[in-house]
A protein has these predicted regions:
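Thiamine diphosphate
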Residues: 1-127
Length: 127
């Protein structure tokens, strides 16, 4: 048996988040790490590159994803600081193993931080 970890962006999860209910139903102790930057980041990056300063329809009004997970019967936590990530992940990993239920770690991240050393603005620039 292996630990399954799912990494999803907020826009991605909003399109298929109801699958969390299926994971609860079948008691699948998966770990969902949800990265919330409040936007459809990839779409925004392409818009910035092709139509500078004319971004449209990429901002998201997100729910409390930890509460969303709990509403389905799973477990969830929200972190806002990097130093809180590892302890929260370990707590949720232990909880998933103990309860045989899915868990979700809702991570609020900087919308500009898309990858180490690169911002969404620099990634959108043509090189």
């Amino acid at each position: 048996e292996r630990t399954v970890v799912v990494f999803a962006g907020d826009g991605d999860f909003l399109m298929h988040g109801q699958e969390f209910a299926t994971a609860v139903q079948y008691r699948l102790p998966i770990i969902v790490v949800l990265l919330d930057n409040g936007m459809y980041g990839t779409i925004r990056m392409h818009q910035e590159r092709e139509y500078p300063h004319r971004v449209s329809g990429t901002a998201l009004q997100n729910p409390d994803f930890a509460a969303y997970a709990q509403a389905f019967g799973g477990h969830g936590e929200r972190v806002e600081r990097t130093e809180d990530f590892a302890p929260a992940l370990e707590r949720l990993r232990a909880q998933a193993q103990a309860t045989r239920l899915p868990v979700l770690l809702h991570c609020l991240i900087d919308p500009e931080a898309i990858t180490p050393g690169r911002s969404s603005t620099s990634a959108a620039a043509r090189t």
